[in-house]
């Protein structure tokens, strides 16, 4: 009995090891995988919306009416802040923003490149949609991108320099 259990465990571990797909190692491999992913409407068994309106349809299916009412009652800033680490993370992971998906690819075309910015955009736009407000997409995108740049600049401003190199240029020999 012990031997059968041991063999079964090793067999399962061996199959699990082979079932894992290695991440791309080169830029060309990454681009190839990315180009395949952005054409798919389904990643890992999860439907990927094609655009923002399709994302709204999916969120309406997944979120209960009472939860939508709670979400609507919050201010936009409060909703975006409170849901960033729950709904926002769910969106990033399940809709394939890190590895690329057709939805993240469409957002890149709008000027959003960071996965967290994309999820923030969806949360804020969904809040506006539920509250029957104008989406004002270009202004919203501009605000999100500016906030990302400002945060990045502040982080870099106070960051210590780990190593500084000085390039010595050899003097030209005179003839």
Predicted segments with their positions:
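Sec-dependent signal peptide cleavage junction
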Residues: 17-57, 139-175
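N-terminal Sec/ER secretory leader and immediately downstream segment
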Residues: 27-97
